[in-house]
């Protein structure tokens, strides 16, 4: 018994070490991405000035991720590391929740009446299937990629999985304390990103579905939703709360538009989902898991064991996915990341059931290697050499185009050195995004260094930069070659100081006036 506990303890420690090693190695090999630059810059502003804690709302974004990042910024000198660490720890919380979620899901039909004994027995009985779920999360490129980005999506996924875990517990043990905790989880999810509304609807639907014979207990999830709504309305303390709803309209089609063309964008977005799953999960894993689930359902049907609880996982995965595909104007992998926890549990259960049908341990090992070798290879390459990697078309902006920040940190290092001996003024392309925010995060609170976003499409050197030069300042212009529109006469008057290659044959150019 003691030996078994020690082995399980070692397995837990190994999973934790594997997670942190996989997420922290080469953490900044991918340069700052446009949205990362914006979120980190907001966090810096919040950290430096408390009255700006609601500044993300000016662009219609909920601020929880930035609030957490503002705290973490105190412990790291590199702002990009600070922002990405938030996602790393959100992902770590997610593997813990997935472990617990798998355990209680597999034991959901238990007759145990005490919640703590139920949790303990579920973990003991389903330890290794639950560990496999956590391992699966670590080895899927989909989750690996976004756990290492300073974006709010992994944090949203964590709260989504936590809400699913809590509503399953609440459904089995209808208690007011669980209802209150679920309400706080829903509220925090809502403070993270707008898609948390799916968790609100699904939590209520899940409870009603699993407790339809106990209508007197339906008030519990309603209390949860009420608490979540109260927490969300904290945002009304800040200015421009209405911008959240207005900006949401920029990302989704209205119901009227959807009814006019119900298959567009639904069909192309579902096709994109097919390729995203192929690239970032792998079809061998999905096909084997599906086969395992079918075998499990056939076995349960013969034993007259209903598979109703699996409908909960399927709905938490497929309904938000279809809703996003039908409504989203812009569709990328990160916008469906929050649907993955339920899918990962289904994959884990199906795959382990398929493995259990195989008698040869050698064949099991060979199958595991064959299924995961491509995923591990992708993880290695995107970590060590992202410059030469190709992502699916919906994700290319992380490595190519103006949204990728190749050369920005090196430009900032050079400019900070110059600021020690001169008053430096830097004009950049853009007014919001990778530039100038990407440069500002690396030069925050640096004396004698001022960064100005000059917008797009200018054909002459901005007058403000010329004036600064005439007043004796050291003046620079940072711009992507693909966006350089300055006429040849003025371009000849600029001195190219540095250039940084980008994977799409573009360059980031640093000129001095």
What is the predicted function of each stretch?
Residues 63-67, 76-96, 146, 150, ...:
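Loop-to-helix entry region of an early transmembrane alpha helix in multi-pass inner-membrane enzymes
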Residues 8, 12-16, 223-227, 300-301, ...:
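Signature aromatic-anchored transmembrane alpha helix within multi-pass, membrane-resident enzymes
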Residues 16-19, 130-138, 165, 186, ...:
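Short helix- or helix-capping micro-motifs
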Residues 367-505:
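Catalytic lumenal/periplasmic loop and adjoining terminal transmembrane helix
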Residues 106, 110-114, 119, 123, ...:
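Membrane-interface transmembrane helices that cradle and orient dolichyl/undecaprenyl
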Residues 39, 188, 197-309, 318-320, ...:
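Transmembrane-lumen/periplasm boundary regions of multi-pass, lipid-linked membrane glycan transferases
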């Amino acid at each position: 018994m003691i030996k078994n506990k020690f082995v399980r303890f070692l397995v837990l420690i190994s999973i934790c070490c594997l997670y942190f090693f996989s997420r922290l190695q080469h953490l900044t090999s991918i340069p700052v991405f446009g949205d990362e630059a914006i979120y980190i810059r907001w966090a810096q502003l919040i950290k430096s000035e408390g009255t700006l804690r609601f500044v993300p709302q000016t662009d219609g974004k909920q601020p929880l991720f930035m609030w957490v990042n503002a705290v973490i910024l105190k412990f790291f000198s590199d702002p990009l590391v600070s922002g990405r660490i938030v996602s790393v720890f959100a992902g770590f919380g997610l593997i813990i929740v997935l472990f617990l979620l798998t355990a209680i899901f597999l034991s959901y039909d238990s007759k145990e009446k005490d919640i703590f004994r139920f949790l303990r027995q579920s973990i003991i009985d389903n330890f290794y299937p639950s560990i496999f779920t956590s391992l699966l999360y670590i080895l899927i490129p989909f989750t690996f990629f976004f756990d290492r980005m300073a974006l709010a999506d992994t944090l949203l996924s964590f709260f989504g999985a936590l809400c699913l875990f809590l509503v399953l517990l609440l459904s089995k043990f209808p208690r007011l304390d669980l209802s209150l905790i679920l309400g706080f989880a829903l509220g925090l999810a809502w403070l993270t990103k707008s898609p948390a509304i799916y968790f609100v609807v699904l939590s209520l639907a899940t409870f009603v579905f699993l407790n339809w014979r106990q209508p007197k207990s339906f008030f519990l999830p309603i209390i949860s939703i009420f608490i979540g709504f109260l927490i969300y309305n904290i945002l009304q303390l800040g200015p421009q709360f209405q911008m959240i709803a207005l900006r949401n309209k920029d990302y989704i089609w209205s119901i009227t538009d959807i009814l006019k063309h119900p298959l567009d964008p639904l069909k192309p977005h579902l096709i994109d989902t097919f390729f995203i799953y192929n690239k970032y999960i792998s079809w061998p894993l999905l096909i084997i898991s599906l086969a395992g689930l079918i075998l499990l359902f056939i076995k349960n049907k013969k034993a007259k064991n209903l598979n109703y609880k699996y409908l909960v996982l399927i709905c938490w995965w497929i309904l938000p996915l279809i809703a996003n595909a039908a409504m989203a104007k812009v569709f990328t992998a990160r916008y469906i990341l929050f649907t993955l926890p339920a899918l990962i549990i289904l994959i884990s259960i199906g795959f382990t059931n398929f493995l259990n049908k195989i008698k040869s341990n050698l064949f099991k090992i060979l199958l595991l290697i064959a299924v995961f070798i491509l995923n591990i290879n992708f993880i290695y390459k995107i970590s060590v050499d992202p410059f030469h990697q190709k992502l699916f078309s919906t994700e290319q902006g992380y490595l190519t185009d103006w949204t990728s920040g190749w050369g920005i940190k090196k430009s900032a290092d050079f400019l900070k050195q110059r600021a020690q001996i001169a008053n430096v003024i830097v004009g950049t392309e853009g007014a919001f995004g990778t530039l100038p925010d990407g440069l500002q995060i690396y030069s925050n609170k640096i004396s004698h260094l001022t960064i100005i976003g000059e917008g797009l499409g200018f054909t002459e050197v901005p007058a403000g930069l010329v004036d600064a030069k005439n007043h004796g300042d050291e003046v620079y212009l940072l711009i992507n070659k693909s966006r350089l529109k300055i006429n040849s006469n003025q371009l000849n008057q600029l001195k190219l100081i540095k250039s940084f290659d980008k994977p799409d044959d573009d360059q980031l150019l640093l000129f001095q006036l």
